[in-house]
Every structure is written in C-alpha cells, then in structure tokens.
Amino acid sequence: MAQHLPPVGGNGGAHTQPSLPALPAHLQSDTHLTGHLASRFHVSLPTAKLSSHAFISINTYTSSSKGQDGGKAGSAQGEAEDMADRAFLRLGHRSENQAILFLGESGSGKTTIRSHILTALLNKTSTPLSTKVSLAAYVFDTLTTTKTATTPTASKAGLFYELQYDTASTTSPLLIGGKLLDHRLERSRITDVPTGERNFHILYYILAGTSAAEKTHLGFGEPDAGTGSKRWRYLGHPTQLKVGINDAQGFQLFKTALRKLEFPRSEIAEICQVLASILHIGQLEFESSENTTVAGDESGGFSHEGGQITTVAKNKDVLAIVAAFLGVSAAELQTTLGYKTKIIHKERVTVMLDPAGARANANELARTLYSLLVAYVIENINQKICAPEEAIVNTVSIIDFPGFSQQSSTGSSLDLLLNNAAAEAMYNLTLQNFFDRKADLLETEEVSVPPTSYFDNSDAVKGLLKTGNGLLSILDDQTRRHRTDMQLLESLRKRFEGKNPAIGVSAATAKLPGSNFLSENTAASFTVRHFAGEVEYSIKGLVEENGEVISGDLLNLVNSTKSDFIARLFGQEALHTVTHPQERTTVMQASVSSKPMRAPSVMSRKIRPGTARTTRQRKESISGRQDTLDDIASEAGDSRRPVNKPSEEGASGQFLHSLDNVTKSFHAQNTNAYFVFCLKPNDRRIANQFDSKCVRTQMQTFGIAEISQRIRSADFSVFLPFGEFLGLADVDTLLVGSEREKVEAVVDEKRWPTNEIQIGSTGVFISERCWMEIAQLSDMVTGRFGVPESEGGTPLANMPYGASKERLIAAGNSPYNNDKAKSGYFGSNDIDGRSDAGVSAFGGGDMFKNLDTREQMAERGNEKSMVEVEEFKDSPSRKRWVFITWMLTFFVPEFLIQHLGKMPRKDVRMAWREKLAINFIIWFSCLAAAFILVVFPMLVCPTQYVFTGEELSAYNGKDGKASYAAIRGQVFDIGSFIPRHPLPYLPSKLFTQYAGTDITGLFPVQVSALCQGTTGSVNPAVLLDYKDTNITDSPNVFNSQDLNSRYHDFRYFTNDTRPDWFSQMMITFRGTYKKGNIGYPAQVVQKMAQQRNAIAILNGRVYDFTKYIAGGRDFRVKYNETRPTDQSLLDFMDPSVVRLFSDRSGEDVTPLWDALRLDPTLRKSMQLCLDNLFYLGDVDTRNSVRCNFAKYFILAVTIILCSIIAFKFLAALQFGTKNMPENLDKFIMCQIPAYTEDEESLRRAIDSAARMRYDDKRKLLIVVCDGMIIGQGNDRPTPRIVLDILGVSETVDPEPLSFESLGEGLKQHNMGKVYSGLYEVQGHIVPFLVVVKVGKPSEVSRPGNRGKRDSQMVIMRFLNRVHYNLAMSPLELEMYHQIRNIIGVNPTFYEYMLQIDADTVVAADSATRFVSAFLDDTRLIACCGETSIANAKSSFITMIQVYEYYISHNLSKAFESLFGSVTCLPGCFSMYRIRAAETGKPLFVSREVVDAYATIRVDTLHMKNLLHLGEDRYLTTLLLKYHNKYKTKYIYRAHAWTIAPDSWKVFLSQRRRWINSTVHNLIELIPMGQLCGFCCFSMRFIVFIDLLSTIIQPVTIAYIVYLIVRMVLTPDLVPVLAFVLLAAVYGLQAIIFILRRKWEMIAWMILYIIAMPIFSFGLPLYAFWHMDDFTWGNTRVVTGEKGKKVVVTDEGKFDPSSIPRKKWEEYQSELWDAQTSKDDTRSEASGFSYATKAPVAVSEYGFPVNPYGAYPPSRPGSTTGIPHMPHMPYSASRMSLAHSEMLMAGNRQSQFGGSQFNLPQSGSEMELSNLAGLPSDDALLAEIREILRTADLMTVTKKGVKQELERRFGVNLDSRRAYINSATEALLSGQL
C-alpha cells in the first residue's frame, strides 16, 4: 500500500484534509468524495487538491477570495494563486512551458479562477506590459462573454491565452509578451438572443455607458413610451438591460482598456460606431413594396411595367444610421439587403428576398460585423503585446473553452456541436495527461504502475475530431462539395454505422403519420455519446450553417465604403474570400474565420524553428488587395495553414484545425500541464447551498474518483536523471556508491510516498511537491514574487468588476463585489502612466466630438468615385430647351431644390426643373383649353338674366313653374314673397293671379321721391302716368285701376303719405326676390319707336318718354289745398334730354347722351330720374351675332372631337376581310425576354409561341434571360427555369462569352451563354436558342441584368452585324454558329421577328396573320395585333382596364392604321420586318435604328422618358423616322393575352410611364414631315391632336362635367345637342363590339365609364408631376476643365477593344483550319470558346497567348443539349437539321493552338515579350533582386515592385504582372 501525506490541518475534522487522493481507499468513491467536498464547502473551504498540478473549485456564488475564517487559505483565489506560484517556479527553474487547462460546466466559475491565475502570474512581473496583458483579457471577456441562465458572465468563445517569457538568463522569468487566441465565437447569439439571457456584454455596455451627446450621435434616442426601455431586437427582453450588471461602468473600463492598449481615440470611436450599427441593424423592419421608380435595367412584360415587387426597409431613419456608420449609401444598403447572391451549380445567382429573407440577410451582416470586429480588436491587441517569436523562450498557456451543453440556447446545431467537440477534446487531454502521459518513458525506465480503470472517451474524440474521416472533417468536406443535409447524413451513416459506438445516425426517411410511404425525415439527426452525456444534433441546415457564407453582395457593398475603418475591418485576414477563378479581383463570397489568426508559439517554433512569425492585417480593399512582401515571406512556409485553402474550409474544418493546434501544443515536449476542475454546487445559483446530487453528477462526468485513484498510484510530474536529481539533493560527495544507490539513499532518507516517486533505470520519476522540496523551492510557493499585496496598485484595481465580471458572486448582490482584492484584470500595481491623462479625458464627454457627424458620414457614403468617360456637347435644340426651362423656373432657387428637395446632383435638379417647365406648359395648355371652352364664350357673350314678355308669361305658377312678376322693368319671384307678406292671412290665390304679368300699375310712385328734377327738387303734387302697354303690347298687364293698387298708394295727395315707401320696398325686393330684368331685343325697340313711342336705348338699358312727352304730367293736391298754377313745375326733366329721346326714338343714344353739355350734378340727377321713372328693361342681346358665335363655337368644338372618334369608328369597321395564304414559307424568329417570371408564366408564353400554326422548321424560338436572378416565389434562377422547360440538362454548361450591353461604364461589357436545341410540345418540334446574360465575373449583384431594351438589342445587334457582314463579338459568333451549324438555317434567311413578353400568350394563328399581312403589303415594316387582358377579373383595377384595352386597339390603333402610321407597337405582341423582301435591305435592324435604339447615355428627362419609360413606343418612333416610306399597321385578327397590373400602385406607375412616354414620343413625331397625308388629313395633324388630347385630358373631363351641368341648368338646344352628339359618338363604340358579338363588353364599358375620371383626370395629373421619377444611376454630365462638358461615371471607363470581334468568314475559316489540323487520335473533342480578351499577354491560368488574348478552351458539348455525335441520343430534343455541319462543329478545337488540357505552347511568352520590346525574364529577375535587397519588406508591395521596374525599364509591364508577382514570391520564399 502506498504511503500518503498526513492530513493537512492537524487533528481537525474530516474537512481539514485538502487532498482527495490522501483520503482512505474506502472513501474514494464518487459518493464519499462528494461528501468530503460538502464538508469542506460548509466550512467555507470550497476547494480541494487532486495533486500538485490539479485542484477542484466549487463555485460558492459569493466572494472567491474568502476561505475559512475570512482568510484566503482554502478559497478559490488562494488555490489559484498557489497553482500560479508553482507554475511560475517550474517556468523559471526548469524552463518548461506551462499549460493550465480549465474544465467545468457553464456557471462553474472557470472564468473567475482563470482571472485569478492570470492576475497572480502578472503580479510576478512589474512591467507596463503586464497591465496591457491584463487589459487584453478584459477586452476579450467583454467581447465574448454573456449572461446565461446559469451565470451572469458565461464565456462564449474558446480562449488560448499565451504569456510569453524569456527564461534564458535567470530563474525569475521576464514577461516579454502575450498572445490572445480566440476559438469559435458563438455567432448565432449575436442575432438570436435566448429568452432570459443576454447578448454579448459590450452591446449593453455601449447602450448604458455613452453620454447624452454620444447617444445622439449613435442614434440611440429615447426609450419607448410606456415601457420605459426601448425594445432592441438584439438585446433580448428589455428586462435584460437591468439585471444587476453595471453596464455603464463596464463601458468606461472597456474604453480605458482599449486606450491603454494603444488604440487611437478615433479607432475606439469607430469601434463604438460599428457596435451601434449592429444594434441598429437589429431594428430594421422590412416590407414588400412595389418599386415603381424606373430603372434602366428593368425587364419583363406588361405585368412588370408598373414596377416589380421588392423588399424595402420600413424605418428609413434607422437604415440611414446604419449606412452612415458603414460609409455606404442608404439606397445601396437597402438594395443589398433585399438581394442575396448565391453560388448554385457554380453559377452566381441573385435571389430577390422577401421581408423574412431580408431580415435574415441583415442578421448575416450583423454577425459578420461583430465577428470581424472581435477578430480585428484581438489581432490589433496581439500586434501590441505579442513578442517576436525568436525572443520567446517559454510560455504559460491558459486554456479555457466554454463548458459542455446538452442543448443550444440559440438554436444553432453547429455552435452546439463545435462547443461540445472542444469540451470533448479538452477532457480527453485531461485523461491522457493523468492516465497515459509518460507511459512510454515509464516502460523504458522499467517502472511499473498499477493499472487504473477509467472512462475513455477516445471513441467520441476519434469520431468527432479525427482528421480526414471524423465527423467534423466529413461535415467540412460535404460543405465544400455543396452537398445537401441528407447527403451529409448518408455520409455519416456510411462512416459510423456499426463502426463507432459513440456516434449514431438516424434514418434519412421516415413514414409520416397516416401514410404507408417513406418520405424525407425532416427530424433527421445524429447522436454523439459525449463524456458528459448523449446529445442529439439536428441535421437540418447544418451544411449551410457550417459554410457561414457571407454574400458577395455585402462584400461588394462594403468595397465601396468611404469609411477607412470599415475597409480595414473587411480587409483583414480573418475574412476568407472566394474569388472568381477567371477574375481574381472579384470576390464571389467570403466567410469569417472560426479559428485564431495566429498559432500557439510552441507550434510555431516546432514547425519553423528560429523563424519569427507575425500575422498582420491585410489592409487592402476586398476587390483589389495586394499582399505585402513580408506577408508573402511569412506565409511561404507557414504550416498553420491546412492543406485546403482557408476559403475552402468551413467552420468545422477551421475549428478542427485550431483544436489540433491546441492539442499539439498541449502535448508538446517540455510542456507541463495543470488542471482546474470547476464545479457548480447547485443548478439554481443559490449561494452557500450544496446539492450533493448535482455535484456528484459532475464528479462522475469528469471522472474525478478515477483520477484520484490514479494519483494514489502514480503522481509523477517530473523526470530527473540521476545526476540532476543528486545535484538538486546536494548529496555529500563522500557518499560511496553508484548514482542509483545514492538516489535510493536520498529517497529512503526523505521517506516520500511511493505514488510520488519511483526510481527508474536512468532517472527518477518524482511529483512536483517532492521536486520542489528537493530543489528547496517549497518555501517560495507560500511567498509572493514581485510587488507585495499590501502595496497600492492601479487605481482601476479598486473598481468593481475587478476580476472577469464572473466573480463567484453572491445571489442578489451586485456581481461586481470587489472584496477589497487587488486581483483581476486591473490587479497589477503597474500601469502605463504615459496615457493616464488621455484616459481620464477620454472617459467623459463626447468621444465623437472631433470626428465627422453622422450627417457628414452619410454624405460621404453617398459620394461616388467618378471617372471621366467622354466629352459632350449639347445640341442646339437642347440649348434652346434649357433656356426655356430656366426662363420658366428661374424663380425657384437652386438651394431650395438641393436641400428641401434633397437633390444634391445637378443633373437631377435640372431634370426637376424640366419637369416643372413641362408641367407649366401642360397646365397652361389645360388652362387655355378651359378658357376657350368655357371662359371665352362667356367673354364673347356674357350671361344675361333677362326675360321677354313670353318668357315672363311662362312663369305663371302653374304646372310646377315658379311665380314671377315684373315691376318697372325688373322681374321678381313673388312666389317666394307670398309667405312673407305683411298680411299673412290674405289667401295665396290673391297673389298668384299676378304671376307671369307686369304689375307695375299696382305700385303708384311719388315722383318727387324718385326724381330731383332740374332744380334739385320736384313739387310733391306732380304726377306722371305710367304707360300700361309697354311690354310688346302684352295683355298681361295690370294697370293702376286695379282695386289692389290702392293698398300701395302712399302718394302726396293721399291721407297716408309715405313718399319713400316704394323706394324702400324696391330695395328689399331687389336684395331678396329679384330674378332679372325685362329684356327688349333691339329690333323690338325699333318697332315700338315706329308706333310713335318716344323710346330709346341708353347704356344697354331701355327708357320710355312717351307719357312724359304726351302730357301725362299733372298736379294733384290734398283736400283743401290749392293746386299750383305754375305749369313749368311739371317740366322736371331737362329739355335737351327730352329732345334726345323724342328725336332719336328707337336708337341707341348712348354717344349722344355722352355728348350732351350737362352739368355733372344735373347729369347725375337726370340719370336718377331715368332709372326710377322711365326705365322699361335691358336690351336683350342673347340672339345677337356674337352670342350666336359663342353658342355655336362650343358646338363646333364638340363636333370636331366627336368627328375624330367617328373616324376611328369607321376605321374600326374597315377590317372585315380575312386574308390567310395557305403556304407561308418565310422564316420567322420569335423573341421572348425573360426576367423574374414564374415557371407557369414562362411555360405559357413559350408553349403558345411553339404551338403557333406555322411551319416549325421555319420558326426559331429565341429566349433572352436577363440576368441570373431568382424572383420572389421562385426556387430556381429564371434561366434555369427556362432551360428546364426546354429540356436542357444541367450538365450542359457552355462557357460565358463576351458581348456589348447597354450599361454605364464597364457594365457595357457583359457575358452570356448560348444554348440551342429542339423543343417538343404537343406535336410541335421547334428549334430554340437561349441566350443567358450571366455578367462578367466581377459582377456580384444581379449578374448580367441590363434590362429589356438590352435583351432586344442582343438580337437586333446580332442581326444587324449579320446583314451588314460586320465583325461580331464572341457571343454573336456563337449565336451564328448555333443557328447555322446546329439548327441548320442561315441567320440571313430570317425575314420577320415576332416579339412577345414572357407573360403573354399568343393565339395559334398569330404568326400566320402577321406574315400574311406582310406578304400582302411589301411596304409594311411592322404590325401589331389586339392584346387582351388575361387576368380581367382578378381585381377592380384589372376590370376597368378591359374595355380600355379593347377600345385603344380597335379605335385608336385602327384609326392610325388608316394612315399607315401606328405610333405605338406594343412590345408584348408585335412583328417586325427584319429586311426588305425585294432588296434584302435591313429595315428593323438597319444601322440607323440600331444605333439610335442602343443609346447608352440616357441622362436627360426627355431621353429617360423615351428609353426607360416606353422603349417599345420609341422603337416604333425610330422605325417611322428612319423608314418613312414604310407603314406600321394594326391587324385586329391577330390576338394575344397578357397580364395587366392588378394593384393600384403598379397600375398607377404603369400608366405614368405610358402617358409620359406618349407625350415625349409624340413630340419626337411632330417635327417629322414624312408622315403621310396633308393638312388636317395628315398623320402629323392626328399626332398633334393625340398630343394635345393627352396633355389636356383633365380639361376634357372637366368640359364634359361642364356640359352636363349646363344642360341641367339651361336646357336650351345647343348644350343638349352637344351632349347628345358626344354620347352618340361614344355609343358608336358599342356598335363595334355588337357587330363582333362581344356582348361582355357592355359591362366592361360601364365600368370604364365609371372609371373615366381616373383615366382622364387623376392619372394624367399624377403622371405629369412624376415625370422625373427615375433611378438616375451614376453617369452624368459635369463641367470639366476649360468649361467643357464631360460625361463621368462611377462604373469605370469601358474599352471597346476589351471585346474582340471577328467576321464570320474569318472565324469559320479558323475553325476549319483547326479542325483539319486536329489529331484524330484524341479521344475527347473540345468546343471552341471565343472568350473575352484578357488584359495581359500571358494568362495566369496557363493558357496560350494569341492576338486575341488568353482564352480557355470551352467545355465539351458547350453549345447545346443537342448531341455532337449522331449516335448520342438527346433526351429532350430531336436532331433533324444540318447533321454534316453539326459533326464538323462538334469536333472543334481552339484556334489559338492550345490543347484541351490548358497547357501553354512553349516559348510563346518569350516570343511575345521580345516582339513587344519588353525586358526578358532574366533582366526582370535581376532587377527584382536588387529592389528587394534595398527595400523595406514591411512596407513594399508587389505593386510597388512593378512600378519601380516600369520606372527603371521605361515600359509598361502590365502584361508581365503575373511573372513579376511569381518571381517576387519565389525570391522571398527562398525558392530562387
């Protein structure tokens, strides 16, 4: 039985024994050991020793520094410091590397014990570096720890912290550096915070610790109302913001730590901005929106014209904050988040994301930012604290990985798997150390140790971690191969089923409940039997998660950042990028490293002894990074890289590699290991409570009983050869005997236990305790090296959070108990005094004070790097228009448009001014039309409210008529007066008898009260008779003899004299009841004058002096008064006035009245008398000439409008004959552009085109796919959908070929693939050609997408070059080859092209109808058919369009067709004549049409409306412009159905496009004098009327409303006739569909009429104002040097020579030469690919050089699904055309001389170099040697070497870049 040490602690209780192996054998079970730990725990001794290099610590959830009696002895901190002392001793005295490994579950206190050990080690060296090392650990924990359900600070990343020492010169090691190695941060937590837990602490710190000014800058804002806290998506529930953690103080400490680690203030601020942007990314909300802003790269049919469904951010303010901090444009960020580019089957495909997908994309961005930020901070810390590796002698490694978990709190299977794999590996290291370490040496030394049984987890470790065929390796391999989850599961089954008991795999298929059939098992998983329990891992999504692919869209976005910090963040080595194999500067995707950027120093020295290795951050941009020369030198032999490239490794592969490094460093020779077992006392974090079951489970998990048993047998830590042992023992030299005998004597003297010392054949195995005793170092352990604890340390030492923020905290207390301890991250007594002042100043205030504001960042992010493309001159017409625009909008200042309108760009502001000017013109036109239709007639003939006698008689109160009566020439409504009569009791019949009559006689007047005479007064006794027959001798006159007149007689002679009664009564009547005046036409006045009446017209009023002249004057006085005798008193009117009316009776005396010499007072008096006593009425001018003109003018306008509609009706009736020749032998093409349509739409369109009743051999189906895009709702990219429909296998993969595209800058260079074959559907076998625009390798987002116009141009430009025999691009040559050699038809044979949209279905006889029309009329250049709505009943929006579609075709287009000039041929269904039938002259593809339609610079409002809004209409305009001798027609019998917009927003946008494009195209057509017809019968007149009717549509509706109102109010003949005419002509429309038996159109017409205000009023007004609603791109015209206008763009300058071109004959000749010289013995044919010209003379891929660049040969069968050999069947097609040509073409070879194996021809490079006058390789190599000999390798770059070579040789060396780079690398790596 082995002897053991006596119990420590005297004769106390059982708890006094600190060593578990020292307990008796019967107490060595799990239960007894747990009991012993419990007894110690309850007396505040929560630790126990296992051996001199291992101890157990139990978390008390209180202070970690208090043991029994409040002292440090027995506490966790005490044991930690004791272990640190022993490690330090061994480090100094034995020069061994030390490794301290922590094991324990989450919440067991590992992080705290680790901080104590770290603090104790750092306290032993009093250097400023120790503070930095301590601060580095704090920063690491701040970034990687979080609060979980088990602990307030759980580590979520593996830590390998290396302290670097120089132990060569002294036994007191000198700290010279440190190295932080982080292993696999739990990234899933960043965006998915588990319930009840927190995210990483730093995110809470920044939210709580920033000042008010800083919060404002970071956009944190105010808390939500009602909750008191803002709900942050990435911070979990708001309650997690207040969980007893002092976040504000933690943030201040974090900033201080970074500052002391020499991070610049600006960089700390940038770090905070990135953290804030991550929080804001979590706040982004997304929604689906119909993007109606027009862009030049749009495609698709009618259903796309109004806009496409895109995903946008709801909260644009939050988006702007994120964009500003990232240094990018908010619009670009939103676009990037709405798309995601993936690599599917080696193809880049852009997926249009829905809101959920955009949210996931934003989460990916947040995870990427945080991961890169952590990597950046750690790498920069390492740069500050890491020593050169040649100076490192020994290291102390602190290893702490997250504890084992049964399930993932974040739902990530990958994080759970990797975390548990690390725990498994660490536990295996522990077992090997205790049970297997030194086993070989023991056997060699012939020392036997009793075997001890233990649980061996080797099966699990091998199954998980074995390189090549372990589970993590298999997962990595499957990820690299892009396999599915089920394929991974199958691979795991093959590998482990029945071979490894630790891993079990579930079935891939299962029977669903209620089904007897096997289906895919959605719950498939695999199970791993870990040392701590069995865990089931779901297979779902594991492969994709392991890839951790960062989309190329995000990288492309960041590549344009204006933030230097963001550029550095994404430029570091931690970001592994995947570049395009053919364009190395293009990053397709990337991933953040899951392993440290550095390797342990032990590993580095072992692999590369004596070589320093530093890992630096790459500072180059993503797209064009250049490795510095020292990077190349350091990486040349860096074995830390795996066999596979980092970009090819998934997370599991990288993590496995990093674990392997940890394991190797742990097992390295000269490394001594220590172990700390951390246990939880209970699962509920209750302080001072010991749960025996919980602890016993952990004891069993870690096998502590077996370890203790093993230590009882063998506790050997040191092996000392006999000589070294005797030297340490200081044995008396006089002792006689051999070394072994002397050793045995010493051992016998020491009486050490046998489990701590064994004597071998050449040396002694001894425990650490015995070694320290014999080396006389035991006393040094109890003391402390360095600064005593009583001395003051750094001021930060007394701060809360003294250790690691996971102190062994007390429940309910703050987790920041300092316990008055000088330990923790800031526990060192030395600080970097250099930065104290800066730190204190930095801690308060605003860290962003001297940095750019958020607005400045946003402005900088919107800036573009512009490149000058070309000079530009405005045309004279443009200059005139700009002048008019400024003249109309001068009053709007520029700064208002710029700031209030948010239009920083000058060209956008100019477009806005143009829009405003156009709107002014349109509004003026509308006002002018309204003036002419409404105001002008009123000015010519003002409205008169007069009544003739007959008209007055009609208002007699009968038959519902009103009751009017006349008094002294004025008409009043007595019907309204009757109820208000002063005597209400009088019967109404008494009053109604006077209705329709003149009742002047009922109201006698007092002359003196109404007239002042010539003297100023008239005698009150004067009377004047009233002529009672003055209304055209009408009998309806009541004279003064009426009995009722006496009730109104208040004249002077009556008893009741009231002279002013009549005046007052008339004032009341005029104000309330007046309806007008009596009207006398001028003819009637003349007639009355002829009847001896003294009547005349004065100022349009009729006055009668008949009674005055005839003696109707008299005196009448009261009873008993004397009658006046002076007869002159009766002449109260001036004689000249009386003579005027008597002499000029029947005339208009106005000029004579004005000529009378009257005193102004007298004239005024006479006028008063005329108006009161002699007035009869007004002159009635309603039947005058000018009033008749105004009346019939309205009628004439109505007739003109209706005549146009009538002509359209007649035109619609012209097409009644049926013309269909039987045999049509013309070749036609049918082009279908595809964008993001679904499979159903595409199949309908393709099938309908293929099923057309036309000779299948003579029609060619051409589908042009506009980009590699997966539309929303689709599961495949559109090109793949098209190819699947056509039956092209996925194995057919032709090479992408270059061609010209419509785009800005470098986007003019595009690449595409060509497929061809035969499509069979319902008995039709139709040849097809598919062109897929895939884009250049440098295109990341929406590769290849250029728009529908570009898709048309692909075919138009191809046919143009075919017919003009011009040089063609590689894609066009391939198209020519496919059509001619594969399909078997010469491209020149095709005469007609039918263009339909991908959402259009054509009738079976459409092609026949069109072609027959072309054959009937050789002057016909293009025609269209009738397009109906396929989804008519899907919504009200589509319903109101049905009739409009019908009428627009059958009236408007039919009418225009009469003139042979249909101005708009819709692109959804039109056919064009490619060439003239007689001469073969190109028509549709003529040079003029193609060049004009291919306009690239579309930067003015007019051009954008032409080419971006209505390219189909503009194409028609060009045909009419350049081929004016030809016609365009409408063929109503040709029919098609399309999808119309079914939502209001899309409909509004579509009509905005149509209306505005109509206006601008008609403006283009009006100046064209070639249009047919003349004068008002010319097409120009019709075009003008169309333009005018378009811009005044709102007035048209208002005019119709005006007619209706006027008809109701004044139902005279003319308005009724006008309205009847208008209604009748619109009724003619009904005749059309009645004749054609379209009865359903009746209902559609009613809906259309209801919606007319929308079509004619609302839509035009909306369209005109939104005329400038475009995506403007980044190409614009600016003023350059010397005032010249230049075109600039941020897309780069396009070089046309980058796309090589050849004529077909030359190309065919080279093909034939290559074919005839081919070696017939070769077994595999290689198709030629005429690829893009390379920018260098020698391809870096090893291809040969030729005048057209370096071209890789295309793949076999690269052209089509049609077989190259007749005997090879093709599953989806039949081969019936041109077999001989096909055989020749199928056996092609590259004409550039290279073989299919991509081997260059020998000597080609040298020959080209010499021909170009370039230096030879030897000359270059010699100069490179010289440059590197004198250069600073820390700063020089390969680019710099090349530039220096160019300077020395005086030539451009771009073509030699590849050689220069390779030679430079070879020189640095020692290969040359």
Curated annotation (Swiss-Prot):
InterPro entries: Chitin_synth, Cyt_B5-like_heme/steroid-bd, Cyt_B5-like_heme/steroid_sf, DEK_C, Kinesin_motor_dom_sf, Myosin_head_motor_dom-like, MYSc_Myo17, Nucleotide-diphossugar_trans. It is found in: Cell membrane. It comes from Pyricularia oryzae (strain 70-15 / ATCC MYA-4617 / FGSC 8958) (Rice blast fungus). Belongs to the chitin synthase family. Class V subfamily. This is Chitin synthase 6. GO terms for biological process: chitin biosynthetic process; fungal-type cell wall organization. Keywords: Actin-binding, ATP-binding, Cell membrane, Glycoprotein, Glycosyltransferase, Membrane, Motor protein, Myosin, Nucleotide-binding, Transferase, Transmembrane, Transmembrane helix, Virulence. Residues 659-683 are annotated as: Actin-binding. GO terms for molecular function: actin binding; ATP binding; chitin synthase activity; cytoskeletal motor activity. It is a multi-pass membrane protein. The keyword NADP does not apply. Residues 1-23, 587-652 are annotated as: Disordered. Glycans are attached at N123, N291, N428, N559, N661, N1030, N1055, N1120, N1450, N1556. Its EC number is 2.4.1.16.
